[in-house]
């Protein structure tokens, strides 16, 4: 199996699209339903990259990134924000938290895959 990508989104439909797109390109995908679930799984699983939604219950994407960046082993792990938010202020907030990239929903799977391959080749 290829590199491991954690797909974090409260929408089962979006997680399914991420799973199909990334697994079809040779990535191993680990799913999480929100930031807290992602941190719990990250404590027991090593991953190479994360794709996360911004607006989620329990812990949003910004707080998730901030928490991930506290761990020395994940300080430089690529993290892509996948969100409906397109305002420049939100992008700056994401970048300040440590996001490596930003994709606005709705998105084409090919667009996501191009960004993932550029940041974290399988």
Set out the residue ranges of the language-model regions.
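Receiver (REC) domain active-site loop signature in two-component systems and cognate sites
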Residues: 56
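Short hydrophobic/Thr-rich beta-strand motif most characteristic of the beta2 strand and flanking loop
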Residues: 26-33, 41
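Active-site residues of response regulator receiver
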Residues: 53, 83
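Conserved acidic segment of CheY-like receiver
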Residues: 2-13, 18-22, 50
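Active-site beta3 strand of CheY-like receiver
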Residues: 45-51
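C-terminal output helix
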Residues: 107-116
């Amino acid at each position: 199996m290829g590199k491991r990508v954690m797909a974090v989104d409260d929408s089962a439909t979006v997680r399914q699209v991420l799973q199909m797109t990334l697994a079809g390109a040779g990535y191993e995908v680990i799913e999480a339903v929100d930031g807290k679930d992602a941190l719990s799984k990250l404590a027991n699983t090593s991953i190479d990259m994360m794709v996360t939604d911004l607006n989620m219950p329990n812990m949003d994407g910004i707080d998730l990134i901030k928490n991930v960046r506290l761990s020395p082993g994940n300080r430089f792990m690529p993290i892509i924000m996948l969100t409906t938010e397109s305002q420049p202020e939100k992008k700056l907030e994401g970048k300040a938290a440590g996001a490596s990239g930003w994709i606005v929903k709705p998105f084409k799977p090919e667009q996501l895959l191009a960004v993932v391959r550029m940041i974290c080749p399988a």
